[in-house]
């Protein structure tokens, strides 16, 4: 029957990159077709022509009757059926291997470009850890839960291969029925030149051959059913994915409060600068903002005191103002806190200059009586 190892190796590679139904179909092809055909069908049909006997002595009549009864041997017909049915899967395997190689080359180029960029930037750690980009086996499918997801042109090639092998199965089943029918007859009447009259011819082991023919027809029908089931499986799976994608809510419709939550957490993770605590420390040991309401209240008090001094100066004159004493304000622990007002500031009648009218701090040229 020949060596089937070459075809078997290719079909093993196809088995790695097939769906669940496709793996069952390949198992049926291996066990119930190739194995049975190679072990049982060969010896059964080996003596077919030699045991085909006709009751005539006319030279050549027996040969032309056998040619009319069996235009092609059953075994050779089934071998052609296996080859034609397996060819679409082999084409798909070639496309898959080509896609894998192209993906490997693309990944290799990206790794080499990244290595060159890191080398130019002078990253010694990257040069020590990743000196050369290694070639790794990549896959064009994502495995989630043990299932293989086909995409893009690879999915189209896989679907076309299933359609072609389904058409081949139907064609060979119909062709076998047209050539031989369903069962072999024990007696075959031949009317063909150079036979001078109708000749009776006899087929060897017709019952055993009929059992084998029925078995091969059943396997062909099973393979056809598996191909249709695989098409339905792929179609239902893709339709389900599209429906789930259509009913899936878009990110724009999500509540905004959920989006702002991570931003608050990110803001809390930022650390302040080193000198930030000095501006927040107050004499009482509490943390206040440098622009708090207390500081604004002190500034308003200073402005009110300045206006009060002006009003008292207009009423009483400049005499009492020269008798007042001015005391320096104590140092403030915080650099950002507002200085405290002196106790005698509210009784002071000294006229302020235009430059110092807006400020309450003591100057170096102020008089002290």
Swiss-Prot record:
Keywords associated with the record: Cell junction, Cell membrane, Gap junction, Membrane, Transmembrane, Transmembrane helix
Membrane topology of the entry: Multi-pass membrane protein
> In its keyword annotation, does this UniProt entry include Transmembrane?
yes
Annotated region Disordered: the residues are: 347-369
Q: Name one GO cellular component term.
A: connexin complex
Which regions of this chain are Cytoplasmic-facing, per the record's topological domains? 2-19, 98-169, 232-369
Q: Does the keyword Transmembrane helix apply?
A: yes
Q: Name one GO biological process term.
A: heart development
Q: What is its main location?
A: membrane
Q: Which residues lie on this side of the membrane: Extracellular?
A: 41-76, 191-210
What domain of life does the native source organism fall in?
Eukaryota
Q: Provide the transmembrane region boundaries.
A: 20-40, 77-97, 170-190, 211-231
Places the protein is found: Cell membrane; Cell junction, Gap junction
The tissues in which it is expressed are:
Mostly in heart, and in the whole embryo, liver, stomach, and pectoral muscle.
Q: Give a GO molecular function annotation for the protein.
A: gap junction channel activity involved in atrial cardiac muscle cell-AV node cell electrical coupling
Q: Where is the signal peptide?
A: none
- Oligomeric and partner information: A connexon is composed of a hexamer of connexins.
Question: What family does the Swiss-Prot or TrEMBL record give for this protein?
Answer: Belongs to the connexin family. Alpha-type (group II) subfamily.
| Functional note | One gap junction consists of a cluster of closely packed pairs of transmembrane channels, the connexons, through which materials of low MW diffuse from one cell to a neighboring cell.
- Protein's name in the database: Gap junction alpha-5 protein
Species per Swiss-Prot/TrEMBL record: Gallus gallus (Chicken)
The gene that this protein is the product of is GJA5
């Amino acid at each position: 029957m020949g060596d089937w190892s070459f075809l078997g190796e290719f079909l093993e590679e196809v088995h790695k990159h097939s769906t669940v139904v496709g793996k069952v179909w390949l198992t049926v092809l291996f066990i119930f077709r190739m194995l049975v055909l190679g072990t049982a069908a060969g010896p059964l049909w080996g003596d077919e022509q030699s045991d085909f006997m006709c009751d005539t002595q006319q030279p050549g009549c027996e040969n032309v009757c056998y040619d009319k009864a069996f235009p092609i041997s059953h075994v050779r017909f089934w071998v052609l059926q296996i080859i034609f049915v397996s060819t679409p899967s082999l084409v798909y395997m070639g496309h898959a291997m080509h896609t894998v190689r192209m993906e490997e080359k693309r990944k290799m180029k990206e790794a080499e470009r990244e290595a060159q960029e890191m080398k130019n930037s002078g990253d010694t750690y990257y040069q020590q850890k990743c000196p050369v980009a290694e070639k790794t086996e990549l896959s064009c499918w994502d495995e989630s839960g043990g299932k293989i997801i086909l995409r893009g042109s690879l999915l189209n090639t896989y679907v076309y291969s299933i359609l072609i092998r389904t058409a081949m199965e139907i064609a060979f089943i119909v062709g076998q029925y047209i050539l031989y029918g369903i069962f072999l007859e024990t007696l075959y009447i031949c009317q063909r030149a150079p036979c001078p009259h109708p000749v009776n011819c006899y087929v060897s082991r017709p019952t055993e051959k009929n059992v084998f023919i029925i078995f091969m027809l059943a396997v062909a029908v099973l393979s056809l059913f598996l191909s249709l089931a695989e098409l339905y499986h792929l179609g239902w799976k893709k339709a389900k994915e599209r429906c789930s994608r259509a009913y899936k809510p878009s990110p724009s419709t999500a509540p905004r409060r959920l989006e702002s939550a991570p931003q608050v957490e990110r803001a809390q993770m930022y650390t302040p600068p080193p000198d930030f605590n000095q501006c927040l420390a107050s004499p009482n040991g509490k943390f206040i903002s440098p622009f708090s309401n207390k500081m604004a209240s002190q500034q308003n008090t200073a402005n009110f005191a300045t206006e009060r001094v002006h009003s008292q100066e207009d009423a009483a004159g400049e005499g009492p103002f020269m008798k007042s004493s001015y005391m320096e304000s104590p140092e403030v622990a915080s650099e950002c806190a507002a200085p405290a007002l002196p106790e005698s500031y509210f009784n002071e009648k000294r006229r302020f200059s235009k430059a110092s009218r807006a400020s309450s701090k003591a100057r170096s040229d102020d008089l002290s009586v």
